Amino acid sequence: MEIVSDKKISEKGIASAAELLYKGAKMLAHSCPECKMPLFEKDGKIFCPSCGREVVIEEDSAAKAESEEKPPESTKPAVKADYDEAVEKIEMAISKVCDMMVESRSVEEVRVLSDSLEKLVDALKKLRE
């Protein structure tokens, strides 16, 4: 597991990500260039749930040309990799929320974190079904 940034992912960002997964948004393998939170896609838009920034992902021209020349291979391994990455990111978020709950001194904060944790666990269960 690689830590991409020293910045702490905000509680609001985690709750927002959990809610998006619950509502059917797709977590992407790319992260926000600003806050390093995983990007999400919903209704054809790619955005960061933490900072609300809409993002455009560009392929480099060499990779694009190569993909146009090659006939499409089976997408099963790519789908499996995306699935595994989504599961791993949700598990990381669950771990971070648990750590935040342990460190919390506020009952209200624990309640909010508990709600976020419940949504993340539900999303993980749905992915594994």
From Swiss-Prot:
Residues 61-80 are annotated as: Disordered. This is UPF0148 protein AF_2370. The lineage of its organism: Archaea, Methanobacteriati, Methanobacteriota, Archaeoglobi, Archaeoglobales. Belongs to the UPF0148 family. It comes from Archaeoglobus fulgidus (strain ATCC 49558 / DSM 4304 / JCM 9628 / NBRC 100126 / VC-16).
